[in-house]
Amino acid sequence: MTRISREMMKDMLSVYFIMGSNNTSADPVSVVEKAIEGGATLFQFREKGSGSLTGEERLLFAKRVQDVCRQAGIPFIINDDVELALRLEADGVHIGQDDADAEETRAAIGDMILGVSAHNVSEVKRAEAAGADYVGMGPVYPTETKKDAEAVQGVTLIEEVRRQGITIPIVGIGGITADNAAPVIEAGADGVSMISAISQAEDPKAAARKFSEEIRRSKAGLSR
């Protein structure tokens, strides 16, 4: 296994869907399937918080979703659980600033994808130095999904990181919808992540497709 290239990582971040079983009232595996059919390019398994699965139920759910991702050929990333990622041979791990140490995580997972949440320029630089393949930056907009979210930043931090010549792949996080995604890409992000905008949508496939079309349109506009 070799480390993922930055160009490939940037493409995979385009429509970055995050979900746990407690983020939807529908069948969660079906929601992931529909999201991928609609254009999700990466999936992060985030099974935490009130009403989340534990133990064997959590493991079985993770395996089912991983199978869906494998069949579709998109990366399956696990949030903040290196042990589970290694056990399932996941494609990668995403950690927050209050989770595991990035350098220790990189050492533990080898060449798997490593994503790190960052809320200021110094955290981005530290993540890059520790071997992160991408950073998640935000919250860009107000969000209801993460009760412990940092202060809303808009797109200014993403712009500042790019102004400083930092080229690590970036995915925008927090309160992003298909209608407000364009400014995130225009600021310098390579993709956007979402939970409820797809997981709680009446039609997850259509919601994912709208994101996919908007991101494609925004990236095309930048390359002109």
Swiss-Prot record:
Residues annotated as signal peptide: none
Enzyme Commission number(s): 2.5.1.3
Keyword Hydrolase: no
Pfam short name (any one): TMP-TENI
Biochemical pathway: Cofactor biosynthesis; thiamine diphosphate biosynthesis; thiamine phosphate from 4-amino-2-methyl-5-diphosphomethylpyrimidine and 4-methyl-5-(2-phosphoethyl)-thiazole: step 1/1
GO biological process, one term: thiamine diphosphate biosynthetic process
Entry GO terms, CC: cytoplasm
Binding site for 4-amino-2-methyl-5-(diphosphooxymethyl)pyrimidine: Q44, F45, R46, E47, K48, N79, S117, K146
Catalytic reactions on record: 2-[(2R,5Z)-2-carboxy-4-methylthiazol-5(2H)-ylidene]ethyl phosphate + 4-amino-2-methyl-5-(diphosphooxymethyl)pyrimidine + 2 H(+) = thiamine phosphate + CO2 + diphosphate; 2-(2-carboxy-4-methylthiazol-5-yl)ethyl phosphate + 4-amino-2-methyl-5-(diphosphooxymethyl)pyrimidine + 2 H(+) = thiamine phosphate + CO2 + diphosphate; 4-methyl-5-(2-phosphooxyethyl)-thiazole + 4-amino-2-methyl-5-(diphosphooxymethyl)pyrimidine + H(+) = thiamine phosphate + diphosphate
SUPFAM superfamilies: Thiamin phosphate synthase (SSF51391)
InterPro entries per the UniProt record, alphabetical: Aldolase_TIM (IPR013785), ThiamineP_synth_sf (IPR036206), ThiamineP_synth_TenI (IPR022998), TMP_synthase (IPR034291)
UniProt binding sites for 2-[(2R,5Z)-2-carboxy-4-methylthiazol-5(2H)-ylidene]ethyl phosphate: T143, E144, T145, G175, I195, S196
Gene3D superfamilies listed in its UniProt record: Aldolase class I
Free-text function comment from the UniProt entry: Condenses 4-methyl-5-(beta-hydroxyethyl)thiazole monophosphate (THZ-P) and 2-methyl-4-amino-5-hydroxymethyl pyrimidine pyrophosphate (HMP-PP) to form thiamine monophosphate (TMP).
Protein name: Thiamine-phosphate synthase
Lineage: Bacteria, Bacillati, Bacillota, Bacilli, Bacillales
Gene (UniProt): thiE
